[in-house]
């Protein structure tokens, strides 16, 4: 992605690759330092250059580890991942020599979030990145001594690579936003005429706010369903 880039479809941000140029120097589950974790080490176009990279979604800082130039971020709302899942993104970025963020900071998709560096245990200028498709912020050491999230996914299942120049993608199944089409948006507040989705999409015919139910028509029959608290829209 490039600075300032945004991608929102159906009211949901697409989770974008934070790098303008991506050369993976160590992939997931690889020696020496990624055994058992879904991390990538990424440098830019030229070796040794401290390139900036950008927020893959609108997010807030959760934790920082200054000794290793490391910060944990979480999306403000659920995002769309490259594998089609919609959930919160929690991600860790490492080795930023210029890191100055603090827990609670919020930044918008496309704003600068970090700079490739060598802070901490690093053998060259790069960004170490891991992504969890959940709100779980647990940061756990595995049997190889490497830290990781619960619910980690390989990075080609996480971010879209629109406007990223892939120099070395380690054979990943990297996808564009066009590979994950967005269909009809389902109403979040039910009212008469709302569309709701079970195994298909149905129209709400009547609502009972007092008893927290909605009537839909399924295969020619009216069915009352319990629902989340309902709000009538005049």
Features from the language model and the residues they span:
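Conserved beta-strand/loop element in small beta-rich adapter and peptidoglycan-binding domains
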Residues: 56-58, 112, 195-208
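Acidic, glycine-rich catalytic/binding loops that coordinate metals and/or anionic ligands
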Residues: 1-13, 48, 130-183
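Short coil-to-beta transition motif at edge beta-strands of beta-rich domains
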Residues: 186-198
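Zn2+-dependent peptidoglycan hydrolase active-site motif and core
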Residues: 50, 54-100, 124-133
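A structural signal for short beta-strand/turn segments enriched in small hydrophobics and glycine
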Residues: 24, 59-61, 104-116
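SH3/SH3-like beta-barrel superfamily modules
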Residues: 200-226
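Short hydrophobic beta/alpha edge segments that flank linear recognition/processing sites
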Residues: 72, 108-122, 129
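Short glycine/threonine/proline-enriched tight-turn/helix- or strand-capping micro-motif at secondary-structure
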Residues: 20-57
